[in-house]
Structures are given as structure tokens and as C-alpha cells.
């Protein structure tokens, strides 16, 4: 809403209506003519498109942002017209907040487009080991509270050793679904972790990516973040541990990648003194130069709505105080995940050429090779022939898509923004590696061994010189790379920016201009953007038909 949520809050959302974005102000709708109704429907579709299928309407608010308000009779009239507009636009709506204006009530209405596929956001959970990330995922997705001894985490563990050690070491995804009224779908199912049923019955799906918190698994955590192209992130910190371990590093990943994030302080059922100290530490870290966020403590449903409204700006950092044992604060977090709109405009990428970085691979009995990954661009269909590669000899091969699953549901096709699993014919399990790509046959495949990048050294204990080696991460691809040369200078130190030529040490990869890279080695870390690639010669790149 265009008012301050509570006394003393740092959040300010006053201001006139913007032409872009998914927020629309309406002072009064009245009894529109047929032509006016058509314009309102077109306008709603535009706002929904701007918000990836979700929008907010402020009823009783002038274009300048003044909270005028509506009388009771006007509220009934406006909502009746609004219902007609929403139905014509193929959307559903609900009032999320109602506050007092100068002359009556101001209503905030959440609108969600009815789509063939559910509206989706991807949200990884980051934070130090033992902060309660997996338990939080387990509680949110099953609706059953934790016993205080990590039982909830075992419900979503991927491997036996994760249950035994009580420590996540891999990347796993779990669906939290919402129906049209904002209620969680998982709670309504016999098996709340049945992804296919959650997906099919939901209007909105939050894909929660559970990641490892231990420093030892940081490479896996980076792969999980980069490979899923998140809309937002939840950075989890335990109240009894504070901002220790990998908390700051994981927070830094969100900052350097430009991912808006919220902080979840767990275990608030323990010592209140620790909760207070941890909250103070988190607020201090969020205000540091380089992070520069406005902390916004969410302790009402109204705050949760506001947090969802403004998280995509990247300016605020909502803070949730939650307990996996008592359930305190979890309803606010669910509301936030339900209302937070998709940040990435996947519709604009659907018509581009297909691009999928392989995130994982499986050998399924009776099926053969199955690979998984997020569609970064384009669309793909069953029986379509695509390129897979590059292989160590810089070649690509033509393979056939035998079947596709999205969220464990068998589908005929998948599109940009969806995480799919696809069975491939024409290539062996041992030949395909994580970090390879699946490309449309319209794409000219290229295998890159060297590239030029603008980099920013976030930290290095001494100086970086030509010959320096680190591990480079690009989406799900990672391998050692060497700095061949530093253009225009001899060395780089902490805080320096420069242009370098880098060479992949083991094998070629599919890289292109504009991609973000992260490089790490020991305590050294940096980020960069590829500005030029040097593909292998055309003769070395070929696509062969699968054997008959």
C-alpha cells in the first residue's frame, strides 16, 4: 500500500503511480461503458504481464498516491466491477489488506492470472550449516512441525548419509504450492511431498532449493544457485548461533549476483536474549556498505504483504522470525512466498533458441539416460532433435528427446523458466557431463576454451598475476581456469577491477558474451562478466546423427 506499514518503519512506498511494473492505482471504477471495460481489461493484462502473472491493485488511491478511500457502497460497486474485469482478463483476485484513507477504506487487491501452468518462483535457501534450512523446507512443504531434533529435515533429505549426519551435502528441490485463495496445497494432500500433485493442483508454486551450508560444499551450493536462476533467496540464520560460518559468504553471493533476498532467523523458540542479539547483528550486516539494504522486520500479515510487494526492488531485506518447532512466524513466510511475484520475464525468452545447462544426470532402468536442468531460453518438445555438448573434442551431437517431465508430471513440451527432466536417445550416460548444454538445432554450436572477461576481485590475500588459476563457475558448469593475461596492468588486488583473458584448463564449454562468472580458489573470490569468447575452429565443431 502507499502508506507506511507501521510506526518507525524504515520502509517507504509513497509516490505516484508508475507506468511500468505490476502495481495499478484506481480511485474509483463506477459503472464503466463497454469501451471503458475493454480498456480496464487490457490494462490488467498489461500489469499481469509486467509481474509475471501477478499484480497488485490499490483501490481508493489517486494516481498521485493519495489515500482517498471508498465508502461501503462504493467498495461493493468497485469490487463488482473489478470482478468483471478480472474474469475478462482470465484472472482471479483477493483482497489482501484494507486500511483507512481520508474519506473511507483503501483496499489492496492481489490479482493472479489463470494460466495452463502454475505461476512459479524459484527460491534457494542459503545460510550456515545447522541453521535449520532443511528443517524449514520440511516444515513448509509438509505442514508438520519439527520435533526439535531435526525430524523435519529427514523428510526432505536426498541421501541416507544426509539423514545420518544431519547435514545437507547436495542440491534438492521441493515444491510449496498455493491455491487461488492463498492456502497451501501440500497440506491438502495425502502425500504433501508428491510434486506432481502439488504442481497440478496449484495456482502458484514456490520451488524451494535446499542447499548445503558447510564451507566444504560451497562449490555445490554455488552450482545450486547459479543453475536455478533464482527469483529470490532466503538466507537462514539460527538465533542461537548468530551470523557465523558461511552466513556472510552466502549473503555475499546474493549481493554480487543481484538476487533480492529475505533473512529468516530460526529457532526463535529458544533464548530470547540470543534472538535479540542475532536480530541486531543481522540488521547491522544488512546496513553495511556493499550490502546496503533496508531491514524490514515482518511481524504481521500486513508486513508480509508489503515485503512481497517490494522485495523485487532489491532495496529492502525482509526479516522473518520463525520457529520450526512452534510454527511461530511461518504463516507470514507462507504469505510472502504466495504473493511475491516472479522477478524474471521468462515470457520474453520463450521465443529464443533453446538453451539448457545440464544440472544432473540419471540412469533410469527401462528408460536410459535422463538429464535435468532449467530452460534458460526457448522451448522443447518430445521427439524433437537437439544438440548436446560440447564433448572433450569440441563436437556436439544430435540426440532425440524421448520424454519430458516437469515437476514429475509427464508433459509434451517444456518452456523457458521451467525445470525439466528429459530422456535422451543417441548418447551414452558416461558421455554426458554436468555443465554441458542442450541447444536448438537452429543454434550454431560453439566450443569455447578461451574468453575475455571484465572481473572484480572481491578478495585475494596477495596479488593476482598472469598464470593464476582458480575454479570458474558459469551456471552449472565449473572447472579450473587460468588467467592468461591481464590487459593494461600487471597485477590485480582485492577490490580491483580489470579485464583478463582466461583459459579453461580441462575441456571446452558453451560460453557466450554477457554471461556472469564466479571464480574461487581458497579464500580468493571474484565475479565477472564475459565480454568476448574465442570459439574453436568451425572444423572442430560438428553435429553427428545418432547411430541407427
Regions found by a protein language model. Name each.
Residues 112-211:
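Conserved G1/Walker A P-loop phosphate-binding module
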Residues 49-51, 129, 167-169, 197-202, ...:
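Conserved catalytic network of the ASCE P-loop NTPase/AAA+ motor domain
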Amino acid at each position: 500500500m502507499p502508506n507506511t506499514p507501521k510506526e518507525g518503519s524504515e520502509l517507504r512506498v509513497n509516490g505516484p503511480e508508475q507506468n511500468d511494473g505490476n502495481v495499478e492505482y484506481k480511485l474509483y471504477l463506477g459503472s464503466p461503458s463497454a469501451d471503458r471495460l475493454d480498456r480496464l481489461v487490457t490494462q490488467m493484462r498489461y500489469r499481469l504481464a509486467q509481474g509475471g502473472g501477478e499484480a497488485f491493485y490499490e483501490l481508493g488511491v489517486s494516481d498521485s498516491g493519495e489515500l482517498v478511500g471508498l465508502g461501503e457502497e462504493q467498495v461493493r460497486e468497485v469490487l463488482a466491477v473489478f470482478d468483471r474485469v478480472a474474469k475478462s482478463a482470465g484472472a482471479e483476485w483477493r483482497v489482501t489488506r484494507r486500511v483507512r484513507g481520508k474519506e473511507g477504506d483503501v483496499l489492496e487487491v492481489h490479482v493472479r492470472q489463470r494460466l495452463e501452468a502454475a505461476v512459479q518462483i524459484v527460491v534457494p535457501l542459503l545460510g550456515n550449516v545447522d541453521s535449520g534450512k532443511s528443517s524449514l523446507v520440511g516444515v513448509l512443504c509438509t505442514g508438520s512441525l519439527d520435533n526439535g531434533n531435526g525430524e523435519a529435515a529427514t523428510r526432505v533429505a536426498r541421501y541416507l548419509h544426509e539423514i545420518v549426519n544431519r547435514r545437507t551435502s547436495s542440491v534438492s528441490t521441493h515444491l510449496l504450492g498455493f491455491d487461488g485463495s492463498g492456502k497451501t496445497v501440500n497440506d491438502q494432500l495425502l502425500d504433501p511431498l508428491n510434486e506432481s500433485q502439488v504442481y497440478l493442483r496449484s495456482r502458484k508454486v514456490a520451488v524451494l532449493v535446499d542447499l548445503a551450508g558447510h564451507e566444504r560444499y560451497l562449490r555445490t551450493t554455488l552450482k545450486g544457485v547459479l543453475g536455478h536462476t533464482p527469483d529470490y533467496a532466503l538466507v537462514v540464520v539460527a538465533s542461537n548461533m548468530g551470523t557465523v560460518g558461511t552466513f556472510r559468504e552466502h549473503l555475499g553471493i546474493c549481493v554480487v549476483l543481484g538476487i533480492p533476498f529475505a533473512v529468516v532467523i530460526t529457532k526463535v523458540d529458544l533464548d530470547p536474549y540470543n534472538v535479540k542479539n542475532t536480530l541486531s547483528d543481522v540488521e547491522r550486516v544488512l546496513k553495511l556498505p556493499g550490502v546496503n539494504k533496508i531491514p524490514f522486520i515482518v511481524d504481521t500479515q500486513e508486513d508480509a504483504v508489503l515485503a512481497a510487494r517490494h522485495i523485487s526492488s532489491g532495496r529492502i531485506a525482509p526479516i522473518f522470525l520463525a520457529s520450526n518447532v512452534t510454527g511461530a512466524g511461518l504463516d507470514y513466510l507462507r504469505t510472502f512466498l504466495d504473493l511475491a511475484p516472479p522477478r524474471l520475464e521468462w515470457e520474453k525468452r520463450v521465443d529464443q533458441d533453446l538453451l539448457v545447462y545440464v544440472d544432473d544426470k540419471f540412469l533410469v532402468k527401462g528408460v536410459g539416460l535422463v538429464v535435468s536442468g532449467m530452460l534458460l531460453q526457448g522451448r522443447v518438445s518430445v521427439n524433437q532433435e537437439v544438440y548436446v555438448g560440447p564433448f572433450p573434442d569440441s563436437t556436439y551431437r544430435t540426440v532425440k528427446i524421448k520424454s519430458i517431465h516437469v515437476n514429475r508430471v509427464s508433459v509434451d513440451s517444456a518452456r523457458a523458466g521451467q525445470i525439466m527432466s528429459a530422456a535422451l536417445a543417441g548418447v551414452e550416460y558416461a558421455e554426458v557431463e554436468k555443465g554441458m548444454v542442450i541447444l536448438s538445432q537452429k543454434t550454431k554450436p560453439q566450443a569455447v576454451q578461451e574468453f575475455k572477461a571484465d572481473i572484480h576481485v572481491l578478495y585475494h590475500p596477495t596479488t593476482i598475476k598472469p598464470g593464476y588459476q582458480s575454479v570458474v563457475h558459469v551456471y552449472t558448469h565449473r572447472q579450473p581456469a587460468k588467467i592468461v593475461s591481464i590487459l593494461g596492468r600487471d597485477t590485480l588486488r582485492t577490490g580491483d577491477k580489470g579485464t583478463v583473458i582466461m583459459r579453461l584448463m580441462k575441456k571446452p564449454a558453451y560460453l557466450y558474451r554477457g554471461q556472469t562468472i564466479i571464480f574461487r580458489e581458497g579464500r580468493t573470490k571474484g565475479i565477472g562478466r564475459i565480454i568476448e569468447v574465442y570459439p574453436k575452429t568451425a572444423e572442430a565443431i560438428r553435429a553427428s546423427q545418432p547411430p541407427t
